[in-house]
């Protein structure tokens, strides 16, 4: 009859042998004699059960009588060797918890090992020898189990065989309770004591305690169960003499599985006996197989095996990316450490010192602006009398020693500060990244005549296509059709004594705010601004009491904006007809204002057209929407 647990039990028995013997080398180095004896007895018990379960898996023949003589004695020794090892472990832990001096010299260590060897080795050997007193014949062979001791059921048997595992468990329990009490009583001294011993830590101490207590809780119930079971399954025979007990000692009983499995209590007793060693091995590995020292030794053993087989010892690890702001390649790591140190003592934290230190370190992490590779046009300067018909201002040119930035066909990567009406904002001009790179355009801004509503309009011409745009309106271009579209809100014109106030348009969201201050302009926006010549012409026309022109512009526009002086808070211009000196100052001031607008609003496209006094007013018919690029391009303002 085949074993119903075959091959499950042989596999578990062999795994228990490997798991129990694997940590033995480094425990020998640490002089843990009790733990080493526990591993030895557990490994022997697992190996013995593995061989028996494989050799007699489906029969009860006497195949190896010599092995059976050895096997039954291993089984006898393991039945008390494992509990005795647990006793040595917990006894050693008790002396440590009592904060007594653990052996330091070699002689003291050898004395401690000798005591443990007497308990874990000599006592099991004596126990094995005493089993001859109660041994009725050589051995039994149980099908599916293998070799099994044959002892008589007499009162002497309970004293010689069955009581010792229970007694060892009781002694271990006593030491365990005392160790826990001492540990709780001397916690401070215990922690200081552990620091002086490199081979023992608090984690290992607690794991050893748990192992011993677990083994004790498994051994004592099992020993009691065996005593009760033997007393009930068979009648207890009186002890007569040793000769009566050994009558027919050379007999070997071969018991088929169908016979011994017919009684449920005997099945339970036999299964518990053979599963005891594998379970002890797995319990030990659970407590010590995943510790840090175990992992280190596993790695060392793996390297030795790979070296012997000629295999690579370690698999190359994948390249790891450096952490940002690491201490090896970052200048700001010291700042992070100082910040952490200050955070610990927050009561002495000085905000002023922190902010100054942060300011000094912030420049280390700023990125440099990209270099613009677009070739710039040749520098052209302004004439001293203002803008003439032949003068033009281009981005990339020099105006009174100031160089204007060149437009780029790609996005602007760095923020650009804009100062408007006393406020400073940051605009990141990245709205052109989805646009292609068209060729540069020359956009002309021409002066348009006054209309009957006293509004000023300007003409913007591009490759022959001209259109008129009212002054003071913010425009933006459509990214798809490349057409200029006016916004629906303007800066309100503040009325003067001789001019009526213009009705303000409703305040709707756009890139140009309807309040007195501008919001951040995008790079595709521009606003048509008046010039000093317009102010001079308007003032001179008002003083003469006449209207310069009655022709209506090609497009109706929103109310007129004030002059640059009123718009940017500069003192009002003194424009009087015939006053050449005052007019020259006006032109100089207006040129400065134009430079300020170009500097502060760059790279936004700002078309500010100026004209000289006396220039003829022209009106160009509207031929449709001009094709104006959405990003800043080269501009030319002329009359």
From Swiss-Prot:
InterPro entries, alphabetized: GPCR_Pheromne_B_alpha_rcpt, GPCR_STE3
Keywords noted in UniProt: G-protein coupled receptor, Membrane, Pheromone response, Receptor, Transducer, Transmembrane, Transmembrane helix
Subcellular location, record wording: Membrane
Bias (Low complexity): 383-398, 541-551, 611-621
Chain ranges passing through the membrane: 8-28, 37-57, 70-90, 113-133, 163-183, 209-229, 272-292
Family to which this protein belongs: Belongs to the G-protein coupled receptor 4 family.
A biological process term (GO) from this entry: pheromone-dependent signal transduction involved in conjugation with cellular fusion
Protein name as it appears in the record: Pheromone B alpha 1 receptor
Gene name, Swiss-Prot/TrEMBL: BAR1
Coiled coil: none
Annotated membrane topology: Multi-pass membrane protein
Gene Ontology cellular-component annotations: plasma membrane
Molecular function (Gene Ontology), one example: mating-type alpha-factor pheromone receptor activity
Chain spans, region Disordered: 375-416, 490-516, 532-563, 611-639
Record's function text: Receptor for the BAP1 pheromone, a prenylated mating factor. Has a role in the initiation of B-regulated nuclear migration.
Species assigned in the record: Schizophyllum commune (Split gill fungus)
